[in-house]
């Protein structure tokens, strides 16, 4: 029912599972080759995920207590901003953003690991004190090829809803060279989330 990065999502015995695409075949059921392939698929579906060698760093935005101390917005910058904020809260649910982002991040971690990714969590509890610069440093040192930050924006205007992604501009002095790849990934994430949930697609904001 789906395929990507060498893995396929298949329906097997009324269950959805992920297997390496190399195990799939168009051989007619009942043949000896089809039997061997099915056995391999069952073993893969029941066994531990096979690593695909890729690392993803996930940052659950904010934390229980903000840190108003200042730090540069980028290496060597004279522009300063608060190290980290505690975030907002749901207009209706009153759920703190830092709790929501950690919950979503843990679910994303599980899904990615099931698909063979190695996941580095920037934080795994709400009671931490990690500045934005420290979070970026952890991600950089992890060797991750993808760094995803999870946030949940909030407005007093309850008519505003949907999902958006943010990425840097092409003229960003620190990582503008990654703009094209970052924009492409951001768009794919937003499009996929909205397709799966029915949320309004608010696109990619370059900032």
Q: Residues of each region from the PLM?
A:
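Boundary regions of SH3-family modules and the immediately adjacent low-complexity/disordered segments
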Residues: 11-45
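Active-site histidine-acidic residue metal-binding/catalytic motifs
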Residues: 40-136, 142, 169
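Extracytoplasmic/secreted cell-surface and envelope-processing proteins
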Residues: 18, 66-68, 128-132, 155-160, ...
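Solvent-exposed coil/turn segments that connect beta secondary-structure elements
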Residues: 3, 13-15, 22-24, 59-63, ...
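Conserved acidic residues
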Residues: 145
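Conserved beta-strand/loop element in small beta-rich adapter and peptidoglycan-binding domains
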Residues: 1-5, 40
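Short catalytic/ligand-gating loop segments at beta-alpha or beta-beta junctions
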Residues: 195-207
């Amino acid at each position: 029912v789906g395929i990507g990065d060498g893995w396929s999502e298949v329906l097997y015995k009324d269950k959805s599972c992920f297997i390496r695409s190399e195990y799939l075949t168009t051989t007619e059921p009942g043949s000896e080759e089809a039997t061997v392939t099915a056995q391999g698929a069952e073993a893969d579906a029941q066994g531990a995920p096979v690593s695909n060698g890729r690392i993803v760093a996930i940052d659950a935005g904010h934390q229980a207590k903000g840190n108003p101390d200042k730090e540069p917005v980028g290496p060597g910058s004279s522009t300063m901003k608060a190290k980290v904020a505690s975030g907002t809260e749901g207009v209706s649910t009153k759920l703190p953003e830092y709790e929501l982002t950690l919950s979503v991040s843990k679910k994303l971690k599980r899904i990615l690991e099931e698909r063979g990714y190695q996941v580095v969590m920037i934080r795994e509890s709400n009671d931490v004190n990690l500045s934005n610069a420290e979070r970026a440093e952890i991600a950089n040192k992890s060797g991750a090829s993808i760094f995803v930050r999870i946030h949940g924006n909030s407005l007093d205007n309850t008519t505003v809803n949907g999902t958006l992604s943010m990425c840097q501009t092409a003229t960003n002095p620190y990582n503008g060279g990654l703009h094209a790849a970052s924009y492409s990934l951001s768009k794919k994430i937003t499009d996929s989330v909205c397709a799966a949930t029915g949320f309004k697609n608010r696109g990619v904001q370059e900032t």
